[in-house]
Amino acid sequence: MHLTSREQEKLMLFLAGELAAKRKARGVKLNYPEAIAYIASHLQEAARDGMSVAEVMQYGATLLTVDDVMEGIAEMVHEVQIEATFPDGTKLVTVHNPIR
């Protein structure tokens, strides 16, 4: 199987997001890279599932709370930006202050 650089990047993001989801499910507080991966991978899947850009942005702000991450992480994550594949093409999605 041959994957483009973009496809490899999406696959790595998915894998990191899965690892973060497993840790979160076990009650482990997420660090910075895990929190970003968790949010970004969920945004990618929401876009692929057919949500609109606005719906994906709103959804992204509901994924993690301050209690889900290590101390100080919520203040470090000002925004998460991804290029997501929607049914009508690729679009930039930005979620401001995603950890609330």
From Swiss-Prot:
Enzyme class: hydrolase
Gene Ontology CC annotation, any one: cytoplasm
InterPro entries: Urease_gamma, Urease_gamma/gamma-beta_su, Urease_gamma_sf, Urease_subunit
CDD domains xrefs: Urease_gamma
Pathway terms, separated by semicolons: Nitrogen metabolism; urea degradation; CO(2) and NH(3) from urea (urease route): step 1/1
E.C. no: 3.5.1.5
Catalysed reactions listed for this entry: urea + 2 H2O + H(+) = hydrogencarbonate + 2 NH4(+)
Family membership noted in the UniProt record: Belongs to the urease gamma subunit family.
Quaternary organization: Heterotrimer of UreA (gamma), UreB (beta) and UreC (alpha) subunits. Three heterotrimers associate to form the active enzyme.
Descriptive protein name: Urease subunit gamma
Taxonomic source organism: Actinobacillus pleuropneumoniae serotype 5b (strain L20)
